[in-house]
């Protein structure tokens, strides 16, 4: 099978995507497929460079990658691809829409408000949410332009920074607890990982630098594990996920809260999904093979 590994892109997460793509290529080649690296520098590259491939493995992150646009182009070209479809990808990229659906489905998530300009910051609403808060681009990833703000004085500057990366900004209550991630493969949860960043929170450096954080497989207490698994599965169903996603949560006082869903989780050597799969004996090559197999089974 001729597999095109699509990477690069036009988002702020381009470098992360290129790293993911290189790792994916290295291990897909072990499976004896014909691998074609497809580096995207501008949107129209997808139409041109994807011609003639049998399958697209998406190693993209951020806008024009995780937001459903590339998925829509590939469906138009009748090229099967890895991961979730356009609708789920678009919703999960929009943190505000994701949280609205979670709230409607009675899935725990931290309180938040969204703003689209410095002028419409509602300081009273933020006070109700309670400080400290995270200020971040509504559709960003990899914690780019994400800041932990401890009082009213820091809000304006943090919003201005986030608005450089997106037209909308999320201001979300900081729920202090243990950060965990649940990797879902074909609707089943792999072992849970605890994320223990060496910084104050799991920022860009903690995510991608060697030694930026400790990520360890943990065995949760039985009742908590059941709650976490039920919540991860509820996210999968409510947001109509397919093939694989990563559900990030915070556990506070024994109660899990969903932070966000990643529809194209990172695939670098430091990435969480391969670590979780490895804990049940699934090698990186086997994981990639499963993603290809399950993706081909999805009716688009």
Curated annotation (Swiss-Prot):
ATP binds at residues 126-181. Its cofactor is Mg(2+); Mn(2+). It is found in: Cytoplasm. Binds 2 magnesium or manganese ions per subunit. Keywords: ATP-binding, Cell shape, Cell wall biogenesis/degradation, Cytoplasm, Ligase, Magnesium, Manganese, Metal-binding, Nucleotide-binding, Peptidoglycan synthesis. PANTHER family: D-ALANINE--D-ALANINE LIGASE, D-ALANINE--D-ALANINE LIGASE B. Cell wall formation. Belongs to the D-alanine--D-alanine ligase family. This is D-alanine--D-alanine ligase. It comes from Clostridium botulinum (strain Hall / ATCC 3502 / NCTC 13319 / Type A). The gene is ddl.
